[in-house]
């Protein structure tokens, strides 16, 4: 709480609805209580590294007309926010919260991951690097890992993260490129009398706000409370297509 020192709130009082949302806020509140002098939660949990970070950012920056629920569509980095890479995403940031046993377990996992990655980078079949081969949907990392690698601790988990990251690599790069383009499209003009209902990927909440405020460009749309980054990407893409047709 900004007005009462050492008062940490979670759940409906913050404008959310749902057990998962409340549990996530409870976790953040607990961390805040235990580590408020040594950890800055807002800098550790961001839109780019966690769904909790997305939720917190939405709650503190947006005006809520209805109870908040966390959906994957709210996260612009959702292809990166996967359960298989949680150690890679968050372990370094939260190392102060880990016990020695937990830290050792994660270090072992990261070591296994590094060994598997190094082996793949140095392996080729018919002059084609294995990392490139794994981008194909029909390939599996198990086909290119030797028996000694498969005996490493946490091999299954580490190899799954590596393979998923390789197969998603192109999509993640495209996602990052779209986000960069969005920042450069703030001046893109939205035609007068534009029918926002034609954009089927927009949430009903976002559509209603856009119709009500009628922004003149993408920059104005980005400053409307409740408009998500994913909404802006869809809107800018649709507006550009309309401009080409006319």
Residue ranges of model-derived segments:
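Short alpha-helix boundary/capping segments
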Residues: 18-21, 82
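Short FAD-binding loop at a beta-strand-to-alpha-helix junction that anchors the flavin cofactor
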Residues: 1-18
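Fold-independent oxyanion-binding glycine-rich loops
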Residues: 10-13, 27, 73
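Short arginine-rich
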Residues: 35-41, 120, 230-237
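Extended, charge-enriched "interface" segments that sit outside catalytic cores
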Residues: 74, 80-82, 86-87, 91-95, ...
């Amino acid at each position: 709480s900004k007005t009462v020192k050492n008062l940490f709130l979670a759940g409906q009082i913050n404008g959310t609805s749902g057990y998962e949302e409340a549990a996530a806020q409870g976790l953040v509140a607990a961390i805040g209580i235990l580590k408020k002098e040594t950890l800055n939660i807002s800098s550790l949990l961001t839109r780019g590294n966690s769904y909790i970070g997305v939720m917190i950012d939405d709650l503190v920056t947006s005006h809520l007309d209805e109870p908040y629920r966390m959906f994957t569509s709210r996260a612009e980095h959702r292809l990166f926010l996967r359960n298989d890479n949680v150690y890679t995403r968050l372990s370094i940031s939260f190392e102060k919260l880990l016990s020695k046993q937990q830290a050792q377990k994660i270090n072992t996992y990261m070591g296994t991951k590094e060994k598997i990655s190094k082996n793949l980078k140095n392996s080729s079949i018919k002059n084609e690097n294995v990392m490139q081969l794994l981008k194909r949907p029909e390939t599996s990392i198990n086909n290119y890992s030797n028996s000694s690698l498969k005996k490493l601790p946490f091999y299954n988990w580490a190899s799954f993260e590596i393979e998923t990251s390789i197969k998603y690599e192109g999509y993640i790069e495209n996602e990052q490129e779209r986000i960069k383009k969005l920042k450069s499209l703030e001046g893109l003009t939205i035609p007068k009398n534009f029918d926002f209902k034609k954009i089927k990927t927009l949430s009903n909440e976002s559509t209603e706000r856009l119709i009500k405020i009628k922004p003149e460009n993408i920059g104005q749309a980005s400053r409307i409370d409740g408009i998500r980054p994913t909404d802006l990407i869809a809107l800018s893409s649709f507006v550009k297509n309309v401009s080409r047709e006319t």
